[in-house]
């Protein structure tokens, strides 16, 4: 068991869901379901197993999980994931290309059938069901409750089921279409979970039979009610309208966004897409940008419907996605979006929790890191990251790790003062010079290692300042991210070269944590500065409203939206002169009326 799996096992939720075991290449090799993900997944890595399971466990290099709302949902999601991914360790059904549905034919005398093929305009379909046994059990229950035609005999002949009270085709004439339409409508209501009327009717018949001392018939009605109860747990993962749709949910925290997309095809949740990335603007804006990029990828086919969270403007999504955009307001469809959002929250929290785990081993990690770089053990590490959007409101941040743990009292923020426009190299030079000129001239504690977020350009800029401008001797390394904004490579040495670092090592885990922390700190500061600047710039033309009063307003109202909703009295309560407060209030009022 590698370190990544050890950390992930500690973070599993006590929830029902599906888990996906992966090999070193990232290929899904097994899909399973669990009433309790924490207990089930942990069981693979504890105790002894049979030969087949031992072989599976030996190939597991990573795993993912999807939280569901019930064990029924987990079961149905499992069969969809197996069908879609065909993992080599899953037992394949003999007819694994399709799953059974219950069909109501559109014949003059409708019949209930079990089928594995869906044909358009050929009847109504309900399902899919996880196996033929389940579908058969449901059909048996329907046959006992609803008197559909059971066989292909001519309607002028009495069949066996007529004598059981389970077929009325012989007694209902061809012209009584309303009867059959009503029966079909009752089945649709029943299979969609609206079964209270049926249960009330059966309960009345049971009581009547019992009153008449027809105890066998009363027991039959009792069994029917019990059978219905076993079907009442409705699952949200499957959609009964067989519609193709993508379901989006997202969650943001600590400067990061996680977006989860559930792919529903023919009513089945067949796959999900998970992506985590830092966001720089408002969450809704960056979510829209992500959706646009998502569908520009030719691998992602556009479905008939796209479900989005209610905080998102559907007209903006409709402008970039040629599909029906839906913001579900109630019921199962809203719960599907909520489920995607819940999984986004769980995934993002897992990312943060992974970075917090196993700090006791970081002492060994920093010692090994020093050995890899050929330097003394880097007890104190200072890491830097720049943050700006096309050069606006440029800032930088520094985080400090001592003995592998964050020392937040030593964190520092920098506003870029000498650089105009988006120039990461010049910004890095400025920040490094400001920080280490103080270290040199004020006798502050110097780090054992400097890490900059970036590639060769950033490393060379920082090293040039340290060595040539300040005459210091502090090692400088660089951390590069891949196109998914994940820690990818460590650069060090002269000339710079990639340091071979095992992905599952404690050293890599530590560097990943440092890079994520400095990035989080930088973009959080950048967002604060941008918000403050935007707030101030909108008030620049108000006479008598200087920097101190703007700061006072920002501290009290937090945002322009809140300020625009403030009354004149609330503004004056801050000690702002009446004439200035009135000018500000008039400006805000006229702005809101435009």
Curated annotation (Swiss-Prot):
Is Mitochondrion given among the entry's keywords? no
Question: Record's SMART domains?
Answer: GIYc (SM00465)
Alphabetized, the UniProt keywords read: Cytoplasm, DNA damage, DNA excision, DNA repair, Excision nuclease, SOS response
* CDD domains recorded: GIY-YIG_UvrC_Cho
Superkingdom of the organism of origin: Bacteria
Question: What Gene3D superfamilies does the annotation carry?
Answer: 5' to 3' exonuclease, C-terminal subdomain, GIY-YIG endonuclease, UVR domain, UvrC, RNAse H endonuclease domain
InterPro entries given in the database record: GIY-YIG_endonuc, GIY-YIG_endonuc_sf, GIY-YIG_UvrC_Cho, RuvA_2-like, UVR_dom, UVR_dom_sf, UvrABC_protein_C, UvrC
Pinpoint the GIY-YIG domain residues.
Answer: 14-91
- BP GO terms, sorted: nucleotide-excision repair; SOS response
Ranges for the UVR domain? 196-231
UniProt GO MF annotations: DNA binding; excinuclease ABC activity
- Name where it's found: Cytoplasm
Family under the similarity heading: Belongs to the UvrC family.
NCBIfam families from the UniProt entry: uvrC
Functional note = The UvrABC repair system catalyzes the recognition and processing of DNA lesions. UvrC both incises the 5' and 3' sides of the lesion. The N-terminal half is responsible for the 3' incision and the C-terminal half is responsible for the 5' incision.
Task: Specify the protein name.
Answer: UvrABC system protein C
Query: Organism, per UniProt?
Result: Streptococcus equi subsp. equi (strain 4047)
Q: What is the lineage of its organism?
A: Bacteria, Bacillati, Bacillota, Bacilli, Lactobacillales
**What gene is behind this protein?**
uvrC
